[in-house]
């Protein structure tokens, strides 16, 4: 009997916290496979831990060691080895909720052979260190609940700024990812955006499970979403932005609503990058912000206008100190509401 769900767990010097993550996903039993990818760890016994789990759970866990290639290459490796009908990435410092996990497996199990959705969506929870309350990102105002639907059944205008489909949210049909040729770039952070974005034109049928499945941990100082870390790695974020622009222009989604959603996603990515460049405030970074928007304009004038002429697109491009002040204030308010770092 084939596996129902494949998990890829990218690990890099993750010995301190990876066991909690692994323990939550192996609880699915032999219906699932857990591919632990050690991405060339150098400072701890990450791979030894992965091998121990493989030995203890030979019908569930596969430990893979590779030369360091970055998060994206670890996801690529997980997908390469995946045999399950569905595919899910869980970062090694995150985990899945036990009760929601049972519900998710029951849902995936319920689909008739050959009639499975291309994408299954569930809620995620910000597990932020020191936060007084946990922020839950859910989608019942946007998606039909517990039923198959298409892009035509979605009102794209109902998406709130914190409701976009992220890696934490999605379970993809494995064959779709392999058929569309998804391959994430090496040695690049923030490729989770590419992982979600590039397969979207191939997604026809979707399904939303209104359960708080994924637990997204925020609090490590070296975490990629930490503000200072994001600014230090801004060139990688910009590289991801440009690839997403290119892939959108190269692969027409066909469906009008899918196209609208992808443009909105691109707009948010452009605005987030612009805000971090503004927060940094160096002459070099402010020039990089101009260069990013010029890249979009040079690639496609029509797409540029759709990205540029929105409220946030306008605010991050006001060419004065006032504009930068507005962007910084907006960032602080959004961070307090959403709590993303």
Write out the residue ranges for each language-model feature.
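A conserved acidic beta->alpha catalytic loop
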Residues: 38-48, 70
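Cell-envelope/extracellular polymer assembly enzymes that use nucleotide-activated donors
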Residues: 3-6, 33, 194
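Short aromatic/hydrophobic "clamp" motif used to bind/position activated sugar donors
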Residues: 87
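Donor-binding/catalytic cores of nucleotide-activated saccharide
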Residues: 71, 95-206, 218, 222-230
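Short, well-formed alpha-helical segments that are part of the catalytic scaffolds
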Residues: 13-27
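Glycine-rich, basic loop-to-helix element that forms the pyrophosphate-binding segment
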Residues: 66-82
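Membrane-interface aromatic/basic loop that binds lipid-linked glycans or pyrophosphate carriers
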Residues: 279-341
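Nucleotide-sugar-dependent glycosyltransferase catalytic core
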Residues: 188, 205-240, 280-287
